[in-house]
Amino acid sequence: MAFLKKSLFLVLFLGLVSLSICEEEKREENEEEQDDDEQSEEKRGFLDIVKGVGKVALGAVSKLFGQEER
């Protein structure tokens, strides 16, 4: 009987350890996904700024060349 109790205790203990390891890995994966999402948002924001600056610069250059041709 004592052998069964020890075996059951060991199985439950190992199950809890593996469960906590799985939860920790899931938590780390979620944090990595959030970091990736934040980085992609930063990249999109930066590209929008560069795109806006490019449009303004292109407009200024086209105005300069348009005035010289007249």
UniProtKB/Swiss-Prot annotation:
Propeptide: 23-42, 66-70
Top-level lineage group: Eukaryota
Residues making up the signal peptide according to the UniProt record: 1-22
UniProt KW keywords: Amidation, Amphibian defense peptide, Antibiotic, Antimicrobial, Cleavage on pair of basic residues, Fungicide, Hemagglutinin, Secreted, Signal
Main location: secreted
GO CC entries: extracellular region
Protein name: Cruzioseptin-1
